[in-house]
Amino acid sequence: LSGTPFNLLNEYGEDEIYTWDYVMEQDAKGKWDTAHPGDPNPYAALPEMRIYTFDLAKMLDAFKDEVLAFNFTEFFRVDTEGKFIHEKDIKYFLDLICKPDPESNYPFATKKFRRYFRHSFWMLPGVREARALSALLQSHKVFGQFQIVNVAGEGDEDAENEEALQMVRRAIGEHPEETYTITLSCRRLTTGVSIPEWTAVFMLSGSHNTSAASYMQTIFRVQTPATINGRVKTLCFVFDFAPDRTLKVLAETAKISAKA
């Protein structure tokens, strides 16, 4: 998914634009067998995406911003020594998403969930924040079982995207059904690359003003088709901890699709 078409839509008329989006794709997948009985479904390998939101602002009221949305920048703020200023709250958050809760279904609450989300992509506000979170994850009782791959860094993104990709590929290994990884990023690997083994993306950065194009480019990293150890990836997930932002982005995306 490229951001360029989003930026160019205003330069073209309706009769010059052809749209084929995720909703159309999944609709075609669901109707294929009825419309084309006996023919192989060309959309069968494309996973369904499900977006789950958890309202951290309700649980951690101190981190609301001026529009009452969750402030990830403040939540993950680090001091001059690279330590989290709100480390206690971040540890609470990490414990929370591993907490068994039948009503909330936190993503790492059960062994079954952890096996399904054995390879995930976490977006953070910046390089220093990713480095600090990497240290906390490695010492955590649950996330310490995962290999933490920190691809957040400074420098030219295009030059280092390939290096970041190789870091993730090495960590996942040749038998992804046996390994566990969490990839931390603040920008890299959000465009132009695919990691088929990723089944979830955690949106822990951005704000109420995050652009629809940037958001959609990032979350669709996890919709890449995959067959691992004979099993087809049929579902992929987005976990966003700022529900208002999620709704705003989806509404903007719907407007863009309708316009196209």
List where the protein language model places each region.
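Hydrophobic/aromatic beta-strand patches that form the interior of the parallel beta-sheet core
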Residues: 1, 18, 49-52, 149, ...
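A short beta-strand-to-loop transition that corresponds to the Sensor-1 phosphate-sensing loop
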Residues: 1-6, 126, 186-188, 242-244
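Interdomain helical connector at the RecA1-RecA2 junction of SF1/SF2 helicase-like NTPases
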Residues: 8-121
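Short, conserved catalytic or adaptor-binding loops enriched in Gly and charged residues
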Residues: 39-44, 140-143, 230-231
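Structured loops at beta-to-helix junctions and adjacent beta-edge loops in soluble globular domains
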Residues: 52-57, 125, 241-244
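Conserved C-terminal RecA-like helicase domain
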Residues: 70-185
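Conserved RecA-like P-loop NTPase helicase motor core
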Residues: 148-259
